[in-house]
Swiss-Prot record:
The lineage of its organism: Bacteria, Pseudomonadati, Aquificota, Aquificia, Aquificales. GO terms for molecular function: ATP binding; proton-transporting ATP synthase activity, rotational mechanism. The keyword Lipid biosynthesis does not apply. It comes from Hydrogenobaculum sp. (strain Y04AAS1). It is a peripheral membrane protein. PANTHER family: ATP SYNTHASE GAMMA CHAIN, ATP SYNTHASE SUBUNIT GAMMA, MITOCHONDRIAL. GO terms for cellular component: plasma membrane; proton-transporting ATP synthase complex. Keywords: ATP synthesis, Cell inner membrane, Cell membrane, CF(1), Hydrogen ion transport, Ion transport, Membrane, Transport. It holds the Pfam family ATP-synt. F-type ATPases have 2 components, CF(1) - the catalytic core - and CF(0) - the membrane proton channel. CF(1) has five subunits: alpha(3), beta(3), gamma(1), delta(1), epsilon(1). CF(0) has three main subunits: a, b and c. GO terms for biological process: proton motive force-driven plasma membrane ATP synthesis. This is ATP synthase gamma chain. It is found in: Cell inner membrane. Its main location: membrane.
Length: 292
């Protein structure tokens, strides 16, 4: 590598400073978006609690086992719902999610796999592989989560399970584990089981009695549809928050690295300038001595 002049080094430092300003700005923006995403999760919690409570009561008081969404079948066709990001610059956010999905795919080599993808990154990754992509949604997280997309995907998944086009549906997304960590998660989406709801709502009052007015099947279909849509919506909320956290951390690390590089190149610059000054002094002294 050729030796850089002080001017070249100074230019390099200026470039790193510009990059640092960009990464720091992206960190600040991601932090603001993270707070907003966390607020959305918090606001959805009361609705979530009541919905799980209602589903738990349905299990306790209504014969749900004859409903097609509760029936288990031999696993011949498996659908995966993969919720990724539309953008990069978020550390291992997408990479770790894909590793978890790929690990699951290796565990079911004899099943026909169908993919439902949310996010550009998952679409780019899996469109290059031999899996069948049934549906793909992009720009879901541009501002607020587009609930029309949630309902469309939810209806499609429910229909596929009812029509026995798939025998099992698994949902993959990133979730915040604590305020400072996130991880990819895998959960069964369909069929629904008592354990799915009971884990969320353990303190069930079995004395509560529901009077069903109207067609029980229609009412059950409506409630289950709302419940399944909420599962998707909650997964997208969690993924959105985890993405902003991952990007905030990645940009913070990039800013710190840039700061370290500036310090390193500043030392190199000072050394190069000192060497240049020393060389000039030697030339002056040598020239003066030659004139004597």
């Amino acid at each position: 590598m050729p030796k850089l002049s002080p001017r070249d080094i100074k230019s390099k430092i200026a470039g790193i400073k510009n990059t640092m300003r960009i990464t720091n700005a992206m960190k600040v923006v991601s932090a603001a978006k993270l707070r907003k995403a966390q607020e959305a999760i918090f606001k959805a919690r009361p609705y979530s609690d009541k919905l799980y409570e209602l589903m738990a009561h349905l299990f306790a008081h209504i014969d749900t086992y004859s409903h097609p969404l509760f029936k288990r079948r031999e696993l011949k066709n498996v659908d995966l719902v993969i919720i990724s990001a539309d953008r990069g610059l978020a550390g291992a956010f997408n990479t770790n999610l894909f590793k978890k999905v790929d690990s699951y795919l290796k565990s079911c080599p004899s099943q026909r796999i169908n993919l439902h993808i949310v996010g550009k990154k998952a679409n780019q990754y899996y469109s290059k592989r031999s899996y069948h992509i049934v549906s793909s949604y992009q720009d879901v997280f541009k501002k607020e989560i587009n609930f029309d997309i949630v309902k469309e995907l939810g209806a499609k998944l429910i229909s596929r399970y009812k029509e026995e086009e798939t025998d099992h549906i698994v949902l993959f997304n990133n979730e915040m584990i604590t305020k400072a960590t996130y991880a990819p998660k895998e959960r069964r989406f369909l069929p629904i089981t008592y354990e799915d709801v009971h884990i969320q709502e353990p303190k069930l009052d079995h004395n509560t009695i529901y009077n069903i007015e109207g067609n029980e099947t229609d009412i059950l279909d409506g409630i289950i549809s709302i419940y399944m849509n909420y599962q998707l919506y909650r997964a997208m909320l969690e993924s959105n928050a985890a993405e902003h956290f991952a990007r905030m951390v990645a940009m913070d690390n990039a800013t710190r690295n840039a700061s370290d590089l500036i310090k390193k190149w500043t030392l190199i610059f000072n050394k190069a300038r000192q060497e240049s000054i020393t060389a000039e002094l030697i030339d002056i002294v040598t020239a003066a001595e030659a004139m004597d």
